[in-house]
Amino acid sequence: MALWGGRFQGETSALFKLFNDSLPVDYRLFEQDVIGSIAWADAIASVGIISATECRDLKKALNDLLVEVNGDPAIILASGAEDIHSFVESALIAKVGDLGKKLHTGRSRNDQVATDLKLWCQSEGAALLARLQSLHAELLALAEREFDAVMPGYTHLQRAQPVTFGHWCLAYVEMYERDISRLADALTRANTCPLGSGALAGTAYKMDRHALAAALNFAAPTLNSLDSVSDRDHVVELCSTASISMMHLSRMAEDLIFFNSGEANFISLSDEVTSGSSLMPQKKNPDALELIRGKTGRVYGSLVGILTTMKALPLAYNKDMQEDKEGLFDVVDSWAICLDMAALVLSGLKVNRPNALLAAQQGYANSTELADYLVSKGMPFREAHHVVGEVVVAAIAKQIPLEEFSLAELKTFAAIIEDDVYPNLTIEACLAKRDVLGGTALPQIQQAIAAKKAR
């Protein structure tokens, strides 16, 4: 049953119905549509549109419908309804007759779908927050297990300075904490109720919209009916927050793919999250991580899609906004499974400490320490930087690490070098000198882990 047939004399074409109907997408708003309708029944009862008995009967029928559909979700799509609102109203009328036709009094699908979508975003957002927090906890546990596992740190994908795997983990802990904060902020901004805004000008019935918002667990009602029915900022923000978080997940996946490669071999991944080759029997591919990296693009695409859809819409509601859900639903589904998969990857990850340490000892990662040593002897840093560059060139030519130069050889580059240079060139010294807030010294890493666990 269409909710708008009275104005029309001709039949809708089958092609237009296929093009226009949104039930194959918005069926996911069923529970929110029923919950909103129950609250609306109370609201119209409060202004005398229906009696207390009628309100009770409507609410019972809606709750019965909720139970029925939860038991057999296929009922929705089998109905052939235009959208989820049409399905709920038709099913309600089938249960209570003409009484069901009273429920939509004073309400528009415009404020109805805006409310449904905000309720859905609140529910799914809370679940995503829990997933982010689980990933955060898994990463923090890994940081604690491997806090002192030495590995090379990179810039430009070139070995730069030694760090620890715990320090690497804590870098992503920081990123996911920002994701948690961003998502919580977005949900706070979305915590307002559009119901009662009507099609665009507000409902004609003087109901208490504060009470209506409270009944649906919103913090407050929206304050402008035009904005209420045309606002999709919460969709944009959720897609944006997901995109930033997926960027973090993708960067972490890329790091781990490299660390797991035969060229690095710093880590081993569990069989749970890897697959093999149909041709090459020796292969163990990091497919979980590659899929996280790959799914990032589709999340970005949905963000661009909703921004482009909304960018030129006049106030208030336009049918273009029906396109807000498919991308959003895909974003939430993709983000959720990537968060779960990332946590699973981390739970079974093992660090190959000897390989990671060996790589940190190579590549002249202690060059900065030699420069700092020269500075401590009174040489200006820029000059020290140049001198150490010359030492590195000579070391590469001889294919030896810096610490294997004899003192006499080092003195040919700078006469101020003495025997006390060698303790400064060890991996342990490189790490220990970074004993500053945010640094990679082991005490700093332990303090950072303890502080985050205490929150």
Curated annotation (Swiss-Prot):
It comes from the Bacteria. Pfam families: ASL_C2, Lyase_1. GO terms for molecular function: argininosuccinate lyase activity. It catalyses: 2-(N(omega)-L-arginino)succinate = fumarate + L-arginine. One of its GO terms (biological process) is L-arginine biosynthetic process. InterPro entries: Arg_succ_lyase_C (IPR029419), Argininosuccinate_lyase (IPR009049), Fumarase/histidase_N (IPR024083), Fumarate_lyase_CS (IPR020557), Fumarate_lyase_fam (IPR000362), Fumarate_lyase_N (IPR022761), L-Aspartase-like (IPR008948). One of its GO terms (cellular component) is cytosol. Pathway: Amino-acid biosynthesis; L-arginine biosynthesis; L-arginine from L-ornithine and carbamoyl phosphate: step 3/3. It is found in: Cytoplasm. HAMAP family: Arg_succ_lyase. This is Argininosuccinate lyase.
